[in-house]
């Protein structure tokens, strides 16, 4: 979808209110996660699996955060994120430029070995990235280690529901078994793993109906235009696979077989 939108966000988006395009929906999801993480009182935020760093820049501007660290194993995405931030600095007023220049740091590292001392941060966010972390419990253990007491972990990610064995996943997910780049973690597994590492789950929101279905409908309704944009970078069969995958996501979402969870947990 990035090729279609031309934006630097990498999430499905939260299609609430007047959001009628992917960029607005993606901004909505970042806003939702930022509020849930209570970033107004945050001192040090670690954005794990930060992509191109667009959410971090949004949170920096919204909350005037003192210290945001983008952690990503993909060095090319980090480099592009730094270039995006630098471009914003060049076009910003001096006060905003100072904020962006000094408050966002980029670190090339794995989510399974976070390069921070024990008990040194008060917020960790994984916005649609934790679905890729393997093993998931190692990331949760690392999050617990580096968080201060009462520090917050906020995760936004798609999950499977009631697909508790491989055969069920293969049968029900269909094409998504190949095209949905994810470990396809189950919702109950995610919850139980977080609780097992002495986190208290404080808030859980299931927003799948405002993620998968409106995204698929938007793509279907605007497919002709989006297809041309995508085919400027990829062969036509890639676009066809993308469209079929989005429609399949909408179908299994309506059946209650996948969800999108936004979860906040506090270190005990």
Predicted regions and their residues:
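Conserved Class I S-adenosyl-L-methionine
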Residues: 205-268
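Class I SAM-dependent methyltransferase SAM/SAH-binding core
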Residues: 44-113
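Short alpha-helix
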Residues: 182-198
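Conserved alpha-helix/loop element of class I SAM-dependent methyltransferases that forms part
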Residues: 24-43
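A short acidic, Gly/Pro-enriched loop at the edge of an enzyme's catalytic core
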Residues: 112-124
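Short, glycine-/aromatic-enriched active-site segment of Class I SAM-dependent methyltransferases
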Residues: 159-181
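A short glycine-rich, Lys/Arg-flanked "PGG" loop and its adjoining helix->strand segment in the class I
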Residues: 137-152
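Acidic carboxylate diad motif detector
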Residues: 155-157
């Amino acid at each position: 979808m990035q090729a279609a939108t031309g934006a630097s966000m990498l999430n499905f988006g939260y299609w609430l209110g007047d959001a009628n395009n992917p960029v607005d929906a993606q901004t909505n999801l970042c806003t939702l996660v930022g509020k849930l993480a209570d970033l107004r009182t945050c001192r040090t935020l670690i954005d794990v699996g930060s992509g191109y760093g667009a959410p971090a820049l949004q949170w920096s501007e919204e909350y005037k955060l003192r210290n945001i660290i983008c952690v990503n194993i993909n060095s090319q995405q980090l480099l592009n994120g730094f270039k995006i931030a630098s471009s914003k600095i060049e076009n910003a007023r001096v006060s905003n430029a100072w904020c962006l220049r000094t408050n966002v740091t980029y670190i090339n590292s794995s989510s399974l070995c976070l390069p921070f001392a024990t008990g040194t941060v008060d917020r960790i966010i994984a916005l649609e990235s934790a679905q890729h972390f393997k093993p998931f419990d190692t990331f949760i253990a690392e999050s617990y280690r580096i968080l201060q007491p009462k520090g917050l972990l906020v995760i936004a990610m798609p999950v499977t529901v009631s697909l508790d064995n491989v055969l069920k996943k293969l049968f029900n997910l269909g094409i998504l078994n190949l095209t949905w780049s994810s470990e396809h973690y189950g919702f109950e597994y995610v919850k139980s793993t977080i609780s097992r590492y002495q986190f208290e789950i404080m808030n859980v929101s299931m927003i799948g109906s405002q993620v998968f279905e409106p995204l698929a409908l938007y793509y279907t309704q605007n497919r002709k235009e989006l297809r041309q944009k995508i085919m400027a970078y990829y062969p036509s069969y890639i676009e066809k696979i993308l469209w079929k995958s989005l429609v399949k996501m909408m179908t299994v979402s309506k059946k209650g077989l996948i969800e999108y969870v936004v979860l906040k947990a506090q270190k005990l």
